[in-house]
């Protein structure tokens, strides 16, 4: 008579199956643990934060510029205020200022003349160009640690204020701004 260990049959198959299952489970858990234990992302640098916020506000303003009806680009909330199109050109002028100042060039805030941009197509194209120029400047002349984030922070604040003003142009025309519309699922 052959003696067998408890939990096995005469050829040891039951113990082998149990061992294989435990080994597989351990391997699976180890794989999951390694995948989940990736090091956390390092905190954003001031340059990365600046670019993210700058891109964010410009994306919102560009979306409004593209969305607002062309026949309403001359609309003014009050006679003495800028038209919708002129506000977009003013925001674009801030971008031109930021890009030049970011490269160390002499820059004036309102050096862009709104009279040179009469149509929605012209205004949107100029805004897109100014955004691309800012992106190129931020890439070529990154904000180093300890370096001031001016002019970028001032232009971001300014553009954000005008974004809020542009919402009023939408509402005064019975329109819903893009960011306030229900998101499709």
Give the positions of each predicted feature:
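Bacterial N-terminal signal peptides that target proteins for export
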Residues: 4-27
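Short, contiguous alpha-helical
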Residues: 51-55, 59-62, 72-111, 144-185
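Acidic/histidine-rich, surface-exposed loop or edge segments in extracytoplasmic proteins
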Residues: 39-46, 104-116
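Boundary at the C-terminal end of the N-terminal hydrophobic targeting segment
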Residues: 35-37
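Membrane-proximal, proline-rich intrinsically disordered regions
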Residues: 68-69
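Well-ordered alpha-helical scaffold segments within catalytic/enzyme domains
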Residues: 60, 64-65, 99, 133, ...
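Acidic/histidine-rich alpha-helical segments that form the ligand environment
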Residues: 115-163
């Amino acid at each position: 008579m052959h003696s067998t260990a408890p939990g096995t049959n005469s050829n040891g198959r039951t113990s082998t199956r149990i061992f294989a299952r435990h080994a597989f489970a351990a391997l699976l858990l180890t794989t999951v643990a390694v995948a989940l234990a990736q090091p956390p992302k390092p905190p954003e640098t001031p340059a990365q934060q600046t670019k993210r916020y700058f891109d964010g506000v410009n994306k919102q303003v560009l979306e409004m510029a593209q969305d607002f009806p062309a026949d309403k680009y001359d609309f003014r909330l009050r006679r003495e205020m800028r038209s919708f199109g002129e506000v977009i050109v003013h925001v674009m002028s801030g971008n031109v200022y930021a890009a030049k100042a970011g490269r160390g060039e002499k820059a004036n805030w309102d050096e862009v003349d709104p009279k040179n941009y009469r149509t929605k197509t012209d205004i949107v194209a100029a805004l897109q160009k100014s955004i691309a120029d800012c992106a190129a400047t931020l890439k070529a002349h990154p904000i180093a640690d300890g370096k001031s984030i001016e002019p970028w922070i001032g232009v971001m604040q300014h553009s954000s204020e005008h974004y809020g003003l542009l919402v009023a142009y939408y509402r005064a025309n019975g329109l819903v701004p893009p960011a306030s519309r229900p998101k499709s699922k």
